[in-house]
Amino acid sequence: MIKQKYGVVYTPDSLAQFVAVLLKRTAESSSQIIRTVLDPSSGECALLNAAKKAFGTECAYIGIDVDREAVNATKDSFTIIHNDTILPQNVKRKAADYWRGKLPEIDAIIANPPWSSEKIYDRSELNSSGYTLASGQYDSYVLFLELAVNLLRDNGIFAFIIPDSLFDSQNERLRKFLVEKTCIRVIARLGEKIFDEVNRAATVIVCQKAAPTADSETICFRLSTDDRKAYLSGNGTLIAFFDDKQHIVKQSRFLCNSGYNFDIDTHTDEEHLLSIITSNSICWKDTFVFGRGVEISKTGKVVYCPNCGCAQGYKKKQLEAGKKKCVNCGSEIPVTNDTAQNVITRVPDDDSVSVFVGENIRRYKISGECYIKPHIEGINYKNRELYLPPKLLIRKTGLGIYCAIDYTGSMTSQTVYILKYADGNDRTPLEYYLALLNSRVVYYYYLKTYGENEWKSHPYLTKQIIYTFPIRPFNGDQIDTEIIALASKLMRKYDYSTDIKLERLIMKKYGLTKDEQELIIREMNNLPNLGAVNDMKMEV
């Protein structure tokens, strides 16, 4: 129960060894002597064992864990403290002050902290205990990272295994904290399936508690799909793949990025190309009004409150629990397969209207159609003017960028973003923006900036990401006219050769040289062999 509550997943030995080696290398490269190593969520002590192999028996190894069973199983091997690391029991002062008084000086911290997003701590208690990053939506590992920085001695080093939510917009404050207060030595994105039965991508981050300088460098690494398969099947080690594929960037780039984005997939020699692509872009908020459709899942499954009759969606946990609290009146609603009903269907009836869900939106076209009942109490259909045509539709979920134009006035679900002109007198053909949003040039920017270059369980676009897409202003010249004509042709019937012809025009629009075009093409051709992105590949 404790493991589920705290989001604990114990660390495979091979991953622990990888993290320990990175920690040791960082200590050696920065001439730091490591005498004391702490794991603040020690669990079965896989990371402390790996650290001991890396640093030897002369170091002191200390663990802290809230799980008494785990403490009892490991206390003979290491000094293990049974307590809650984040909010120590019966402690009235700040957590960092308490632990600094109880522990020896800490040279290094190695950890795979809990990843749970469940709020098990009272926010006011966290604030009183000195935590500054526990705001909005956050995972529990954020608290461990902040505490680690406060516990380490100056120039001390921490190496953490954390989820890829580090790169999400919700963690902008965490990235700012790390990029301003530490020297980020390593960021290694490992992807999914690193942990058995955990469908979340993992990242290893190694930081040193020191003020970064203009010359501070970060070693960046992404474990490719093929290398991950090899590693998981026992054909290679993480450190071998790391040594083969790593590259180095200036940490100062992260500080300058919008949202302090950790764009680790952008190599230094690609920065110039990206600066060309991102120059002279539209101001999204001045050009478009952004919205999304009916607040309902793509399946359209809802339950009805037996007290007030309001329909509402439900989460997987609520289905497992068999109940939920009504968002309107607070009554308990039974949530079972028998009580759930579909209000989105594939077949229309007399009072249903057309609605597009995410899977209907493809590049340049809308495929298929669904239907929804339009007057169900409790469902937020949004202002009907939002759906008036014409409008650009962008699929929220899935690998890649899928954009189409709707001229029918159909509703959409919340998994489809809607873009309409902010100026009602704007007569720019939407096909122009359609072409650029579906282009490989913009997709290259997306891959390099946000790193969404392979399948994962829950890929999705956000408004914040979309509003960074580098879209050149419409000039109405010959190139723009040809772009619109070819995009219109693709809307009528997709043809790969037309798609490639259009792409060459768009590359010309962005002023890319032949070498720069080939760099983008190579990146497209290196994408995984997945149906979602195979159309983006090009012959050189």
Question: Regions from the language model: what does each represent?
Answer:
Residues 91, 197-198:
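Short, charged, surface-exposed secondary-structure boundary motifs
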Residues 1-187, 192, 204-225:
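SAM-dependent methyltransferase catalytic region
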Residues 26-34, 91-101, 246-247, 266-275, ...:
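Intrinsically disordered, low-complexity coil segments
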